[in-house]
């Protein structure tokens, strides 16, 4: 028997407890600007820490290979119903353990090794699971990539021409570092014209899409994959949305195709997050995410930094650092010393190596969760620029860190 009072983390494992406490303090003290990170609600975390972690549930609601699944069936069906409502989807699978596995599930459902796929080039903003040479998607399939035009928007004309020439079996839209709106309808028409499947990976934009502040790909795509964290503000995991005609193939692809027992405690967290995302408060939050990102970009531009594509129409932006004579790797480290957390990121046609880069990726979801609005976004933009203007001045870094501390104390993550 486990007596709850005797089995607390601090008693059983002081080392892990200490690390958790330090990470909690870091999240409170630092302004999180990594576009793919966010803060989940205590309700989501409570679901993930529940007894559902004990339950094996291979299969799907009503069709399990284990007994005792009547209550986890309720949880999974709630998650399915809510995510379908959230995005207007015909069918959904909430079992993928990650966005990458959601993508893999689609590939296994409709492709064979050697088939041709077409996705956005990783070097110009795509994702490694869309055909990068070192990723399984690049090893198992013949990959052709589309990219950006001179205005650093997706080159839709070139995309269409390439699709007509190469006749891929699957066209993929979606990105990990692209700030503008993606014309899912146009790409969907290209796919239809050549008889290709169309998959959208909306992992970065899902929260914005749920709130109606970014185009919804669901009406135009055969499959839509997403993570459930990032802008959606749920637990770490994945989801596949699909047309009803593909539901059986996708379900078989996930189980028994690439996964065994689903993580029911995480699916519970997904269900809670989807319920939160259906509220008016979540819509208002996403509207503020977009406003904050726009102000952040405008501030950085005013301070002499170049934003790839010249602006953002979403939650994310790429900042070209070459004018400041600093690499993304160095900027990430120095901004971190000032308690501003960003990630190094390649810019289009980046001359630097992938682990060095000429840019950083900056996003607004996490700081907006804290309660930041336009005024704070402007302050953050100026603080970033202050660091980059004098990156090797210890006094400057200390001054910025003090200003960050004043902000984070006013806006705690978990009050």
UniProtKB/Swiss-Prot annotation:
EC number(s) per entry: 2.1.2.1
The keyword Transferase belongs to this UniProt entry's keyword annotation: yes
Protein name: Serine hydroxymethyltransferase 1
Taxonomic path: Bacteria, Pseudomonadati, Pseudomonadota, Betaproteobacteria, Burkholderiales
Stretch forming the signal peptide: none
Localization, UniProt: Cytoplasm
Record-level GO cellular component terms: cytosol
Biological process, per Gene Ontology: glycine biosynthetic process from serine; tetrahydrofolate interconversion
Keywords from the UniProt entry: Amino-acid biosynthesis, Cytoplasm, One-carbon metabolism, Pyridoxal phosphate, Transferase
Originating gene: glyA1
């Amino acid at each position: 028997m486990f007596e709850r009072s005797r089995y607390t983390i601090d008693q059983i494992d002081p080392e892990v407890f200490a690390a958790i406490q330090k990470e909690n303090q870091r999240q409170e003290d630092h302004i999180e600007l990594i576009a793919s990170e966010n803060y989940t609600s205590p309700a989501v975390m409570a679901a993930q820490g529940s007894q559902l972690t004990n339950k094996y549930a291979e299969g799907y609601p009503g069709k399990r290979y284990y007994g005792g699944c009547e209550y986890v069936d309720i949880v999974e069906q709630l998650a399915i119903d809510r995510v379908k409502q959230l995005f207007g989807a015909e069918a959904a699978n909430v079992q993928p353990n990650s966005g990458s596995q959601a993508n893999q599930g689609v590939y296994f459902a409709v492709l064979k090794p050697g088939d041709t796929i077409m996705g956005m080039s990783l070097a110009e903003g795509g994702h490694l699971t869309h055909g990068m040479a070192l990723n399984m998607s690049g090893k198992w399939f013949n990959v052709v990539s589309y990219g950006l035009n001179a205005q650093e928007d997706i080159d839709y004309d070139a995309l269409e021409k390439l699709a007509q020439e190469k006749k891929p079996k699957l066209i993929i839209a979606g990105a990990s570092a692209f700030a503008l709106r993606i014309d899912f309808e146009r790409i969907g028409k290209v796919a239809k014209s050549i008889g290709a499947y169309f998959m959208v990976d909306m992992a970065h934009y899902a929260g914005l899409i749920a709130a109606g502040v970014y185009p919804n790909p669901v009406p135009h795509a055969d499959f839509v994959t997403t993570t459930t964290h990032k802008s959606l503000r749920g637990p770490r995991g994945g989801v596949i949305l699909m047309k009803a005609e593909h539901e059986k193939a996708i379900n078989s692809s996930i189980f028994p195709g690439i996964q065994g027992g689903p993580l029911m405690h995480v699916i519970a967290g997904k269900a809670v997050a989807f319920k939160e995302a259906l509220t008016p408060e979540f819509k208002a939050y996403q509207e503020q995410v977009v406003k904050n990102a726009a102000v952040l970009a405008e501030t950085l531009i005013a301070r002499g930094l170049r934003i790839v594509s010249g602006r953002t129409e979403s939650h994310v932006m790429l900042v070209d650092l070459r004018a400041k004579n600093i690499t993304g790797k160095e900027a990430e480290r120095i901004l971190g010393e000032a308690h501003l957390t960003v990630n190094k990121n390649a810019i289009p046609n980046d001359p630097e190596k992938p682990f060095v880069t000429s840019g950083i990726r900056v996003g607004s979801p996490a700081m907006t969760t804290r309660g930041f609005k336009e005024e704070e976004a402007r302050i953050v933009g100026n603080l970033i620029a202050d660091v980059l203007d004098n990156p090797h001045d210890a006094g400057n870094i200390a001054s910025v860190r003090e200003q960050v501390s004043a902000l984070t104390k006013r806006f705690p993550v978990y009050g």
